[in-house]
Design a protein with these regions (language model features):
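Membrane-proximal helix-turn-helix segments that form the acceptor-binding/catalytic region
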Residues: 110-113, 117-121, 145-165
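Conserved donor-binding/catalytic core segment of Leloir-type glycosyltransferases
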Residues: 166, 202-229, 242
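Nucleotide-activated donor-binding/catalytic signature segment of Leloir-type glycosyltransferases, i.e.
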Residues: 254-272
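Short alpha-helical donor nucleotide-sugar binding micro-motif in glycosyltransferases
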Residues: 271-272, 279-284
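Aromatic "clamp/platform" in nucleotide-sugar-dependent glycosyltransferases that forms part
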Residues: 292
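Short hydrophobic beta-strand element within catalytic cores of glycosyltransferases
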Residues: 309-314
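Conserved acidic donor-binding segment of nucleotide-sugar-dependent glycosyltransferases
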Residues: 325-338, 346-352
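A charged, aromatic-enriched C-terminal amphipathic alpha-helix characteristic of glycosyltransferases
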Residues: 336, 350-383
Length: 398
């Protein structure tokens, strides 16, 4: 394949072997590039047993063995990040003149140094995608004073050597410039991976329930939900809480459920199938995500596709709030205090079917303008790259 039509996407995780917003985003990016006719390599760590899986629109290249990415506390492990960065450096050095462009995740931050050094003098264009940008205090809260300060310094250094940065919120764009980016970042229009086929919006299930779907880690603040639901039940007596996922904070969440006497109205299904997740999303009164930090907020989009409004919490690190239009597709609570969150949940309940219809209408508009395809097209325009001669489509792929 000619260099001009070969692109690499580099991230240490790949959906569906690991799940999360970044995994979905980078897989979809590779698929869109392949759909546009580019020859695409996905450089990742091994996350499967047996032979490397094959994909129709991109090629999976494992560049490291299986890695233990997170500690027991849900924090990214530095040894794993360094191991992947070393694998990325070696893979790009060996292929430095194969690729017209490399799109690499800026998290973990070591990826940026590995890719920049490996591609020096090659003529390959480098795009660094920043899922999130943290200030110093966030790094210290996440990793401790010493490690957090070092991580923040490394982040600033990586941003300074980034030739083209992409991000997915005005919050991240502002932080990139504040942390030393030397050119204007490319802010994506959105990360929707095409329209999803779901039933038209319907009334919330009876009895009503608030849904949380995600990892249980301190930054997600799942443990604030039981007290909020207990407060909301003063006005909505049959309200329930359904908490999906697991993680290091699960015991703290269960302890809060016990503290507020919520055992009879709280369910912990753990991880569920895609079909069950769709069913729960479709029937939820609201999807609540009290996270203090989000780089984009794909959960808003996924819930609104089902006509389900979203309850978020205002925080300086939560870019998901940029997607919320008050009384259209959700409510932003000013704090995590039970009274404030309960008020937001009651506002959603008061919005009834009208709010559910407007949430779906928001999604229908967004799916035409806020897609990963539009984001990829913006990257290609900014580089720019020669258009590949032959365009593949999903229908043409095996």
């Amino acid at each position: 394949m000619e260099r001009s039509s070969t692109v690499a996407v580099a991230y240490d995780c790949l959906f569906p072997f690991t799940t999360g917003g970044g995994e979905r985003q980078y897989r979809a990016t590779a698929e869109v590039l392949g759909d546009l006719g580019f020859d695409v390599d996905y450089l990742t760590s091994r996350q499967w047993d047996g032979e490397t899986p094959t994909e129709g629109l991109f090629r999976i290249l494992p560049i490291t063995p299986r890695l233990s990415l997170y500690s027991a506390d849900g924090v990214r492990r530095i040894p794993a990040a360094l191991r992947y960065a070393a694998g990325l450096f070696g893979a790009l050095v060996r292929r430095r003149r194969r690729y017209a462009a490399v799109i690499v995740s800026g998290l973990p931050i070591f990826n940026v140094f590995a890719a920049r050094l490996a591609l020096l003098g090659s003529g390959t264009k480098l795009v660094v995608d920043y899922l999130e940008v943290w200030h110093r205090r966030q790094w210290i809260e996440y990793s401790g004073t010493v490690t957090g300060t070092i991580a923040w310094v490394l982040q600033r250094a990586a941003i300074a050597i980034t030739p083209l940065a992409t991000c997915h919120s005005q919050l991240s764009a502002t932080r990139l410039l504040r942390e030393g980016l030397r050119c204007e970042p490319l802010v994506s229009p959105g990360l929707i991976d095409g329209a999803v086929e779901v039933a038209p919006p319907a009334s919330a299930a009876t009895p009503p329930y608030v849904l949380y779907a995600g990892r249980h880690i301190p930054d997600k603040r799942v443990d604030v939900l039981p007290a909020a639901i207990a407060a909301a039940r003063e006005n909505i007596p049959d309200l329930r809480l359904v908490i999906l996922g697991t993680g290091p904070s699960s015991e703290a969440v269960r302890a809060e459920v016990h503290r507020v006497g919520g055992e009879s109205w709280t369910d912990f299904p753990g991880f569920v199938s895609e079909s069950e997740l769709d069913r729960l999303l479709h029937g939820a009164l609201a999807l609540a995500n009290p996270s203090r930090r989000e780089g984009y907020g794909l959960v808003v989009v996924e819930a609104n596709a089902h006509g389900t409004p979203v309850v978020l919490v205002a925080d300086e690190g939560n870019a998901a709030t940029e997607l919320i239009e008050s009384d259209v597709n959700g409510v932003v609570s000013p704090t995590t205090r039970p009274a404030d969150l309960a008020r937001a949940i009651r506002d959603v309940a008061d919005g009834g079917d009208d709010l559910r219809r407007s949430s779906r209408a928001w999604y229908d508009t967004a799916v035409g303008t806020r897609t990963i395809r539009r984001t990829v097209e913006g990257i290609l325009s900014a580089l720019p790259l020669p258009s590949p001669a032959t365009v593949k489509t999903k229908e043409d792929s095996p």
